[in-house]
Amino acid sequence: GEKPLWIPTTDDIMFITPRVIVDNIARGFAFENMPPLKPEECGGPDMFGTQWVFVEQVGGSMVRPGNPRLLDANDWKEVITLPDPDTFDWESSAKLNAPLKDSGRSFQAMLLNGLFERLISFMDFEGAVMALIDDDQKDAVHDLFSHLADIHIKIIDKHIEYYGIDGVTMHDDWGSQRAPFFSLATAEEMLVPYVRRIADHCHEKGLWFQQHSCGKNEMLVPAYIDAHVDIWNG
């Protein structure tokens, strides 16, 4: 093929992670039209009530370790309270961040804690990976992921309405530096249907959809394609 004259890079994108979504405070990753968070302001509860601890040395947060909220995915409805994005103060956030839309760059929503990362936050890592392959828990995980997809879609719609975004990046790490955390078959069965629902909704709204997914995940590329992801960002 021919050489392109120009290839988009992250410098061509302006992103927003507003404080109105408390996950961005909990994760220490709130970036909007105001000074960044101080270390002592980071951490605390996310929108599901899970407690995060900010680790200043690495500039990020982790769930408070050693006491996972959910030991069996079948119990998620008794343990987890789903947030209602309609209750967030979007109007005030929209007024604050209106100037960001005029940056001249593609404007994206960046959504932390995708489906698998959210499951990890509830169950810790070992519990989450086991739940993906445990026949006694998989139906419950499907049900939970379906509800999480609904919440993501509602939050995306709020970003469209109040910020006028052009695209969406969802963070969901699926691998380590050596290999994915799970097989392609598991990704196709447990994650792809819900990522595809989110991606398809973005496309219906005229947005591009990028999945940020750290790891040596080349063997999962067919899953990203089947999920209708436009860009895999590692």
Indicate residue ranges for each PLM-predicted region.
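Generic detection of intrinsically disordered/low-complexity segments and helix-coil linkers/edges
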Residues: 23-25, 38, 42, 46, ...
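Active-site loop segments of alpha/beta catalytic cores
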Residues: 1-16, 45, 54, 79-234
